[in-house]
Amino acid sequence: MSVSTASTEMSVRKIAAHMKSNPNAKVIFMVGAGISTSCGIPDFRSPGTGLYHNLARLKLPYPEAVFDVDFFQSDPLPFYTLAKELYPGNFRPSKFHYLLKLFQDKDVLKRVYTQNIDTLERQAGVKDDLIIEAHGSFAHCHCIGCGKVYPPQVFKSKLAEHPIKDFVKCDVCGELVKPAIVFFGEDLPDSFSETWLNDSEWLREKITTSGKHPQQPLVIVVGTSLAVYPFASLPEEIPRKVKRVLCNLETVGDFKANKRPTDLIVHQYSDEFAEQLVEELGWQEDFEKILTAQGGMGDNSKEQLLEIVHDLENLSLDQSEHESADKKDKKLQRLNGHDSDEDGASNSSSSQKAAKE
């Protein structure tokens, strides 16, 4: 379904015009789950269709528990089941992912900051050093106890088991091993803050550079509710002289609270945005070559989401038959922090912790 309007088309033309008038400029992208929904991957927070909504009717203590490190320690099976469905290789990149690859090929891509854990930016061909996965990914694994790093195959091999009978444990400390996905209660990777510190300084340098070769940078935010900090703070920290673009179905975050005169707002699906921007830039032929070489995009089917919910529902029903009400109550109390003197300690620093977009 298209949501294009005359105003969105005009905004896309302005983006293309900015890039054409600054031929040596580079672009920073900040993206969220909205760029992957056309691939069949659910986002987390959309009412009625998001992953949390579809998990809400299951027997988990609360939907977000599947990404809770404490719950994972007590019961890894729900996450293993979900990971089996979401694991890289089950989905193909969208047109927007290939737009990132096109920008890289045109040497105008500075960085992609992504909240997504699906690694579809990598699958589309974007180089590792241009991607900052703020909430981690399946690209490697680590022990939740001592931090020892493991190759992803160690975890993936367990997902091939049917049914999953045991879990990967560290050969050093014996704790569980999981993909390097940031769970609730875990810090974001150091690369996130370190790279953004350098890139924000780079932005300031570029807007003060004068000369014969215009290179005013551009920051494009796509497919995110900007509801999760610290990622949501990035648009706020963009220097005021840098043009910001938001492509999203709704105006969100700092674009809504503190809209700047130079901001461009595009209410559009990310794939439509990619198509129109490529057309305005005159890059259709190169874009088609990328799409052809990669064998096409992910489809728009929601069948994968239904399979995820079905598998988790069966898992939860099976668990409920073998778990006493008393055990459930104790588990829920522990997760809510009622058996700890440090109840609420994590909340005091929650703005610095990661959550899923």
UniProtKB/Swiss-Prot annotation:
Listed Basic and acidic residues bias regions: 317-329
Mitochondrion keyword on record: no
InterPro entries the record matches: DHS-like_NAD/FAD-binding_dom (IPR029035), NAD-dep_sirtuin_deacylases (IPR050134), Sirtuin (IPR003000), Sirtuin_cat_small_dom_sf (IPR026591), Sirtuin_class_I (IPR017328), Ssirtuin_cat_dom (IPR026590)
Active site positions: H135
Classification via PROSITE patterns: SIRTUIN
Location of Phosphoserine modifications: S340
Catalysis: reaction(s): N(6)-acetyl-L-lysyl-[protein] + NAD(+) + H2O = 2''-O-acetyl-ADP-D-ribose + nicotinamide + L-lysyl-[protein]
GO BP terms: negative regulation of mitotic recombination; rDNA heterochromatin formation
Region feature Disordered, mapped onto this chain: 317-357
Chief place of localization: cytoplasm
Domain Deacetylase sirtuin-type: 5-284
UniProt entry tagged with the keyword Aminoacyl-tRNA synthetase: no
Gene Ontology MF terms: histone deacetylase activity, NAD-dependent; histone H4K16 deacetylase activity, NAD-dependent; metal ion binding; NAD+ binding
Enzyme class of the recorded protein, top EC level: transferase
Binding residue positions for Zn(2+): C143, C146, C170, C173
GO cellular component entries: cytoplasm; nucleus
Regulation of its function: Inhibited by ADP-ribose and nicotinamide.
Consequence recorded when altering I117 to A/D/H/W/Y: Nearly or completely catalytically inactive
EC number per UniProt: 2.3.1.286
Subunit details: Homotrimer. Monomer. Homotrimeric in its unliganded state. Undergoes a trimer-monomer transition upon acetyl-lysine substrate binding.
Miscellaneous comment text of the record: Present with 5260 molecules/cell in log phase SD medium.
Task of the protein: NAD-dependent histone deacetylase that is involved in nuclear silencing events. Derepresses subtelomeric silencing and increases repression in nucleolar (rDNA) silencing. Its function is negatively regulated by active nuclear export.
Annotated family: Belongs to the sirtuin family. Class I subfamily.
Protein name per its UniProtKB record: NAD-dependent protein deacetylase HST2
Gene, per the UniProt record: HST2
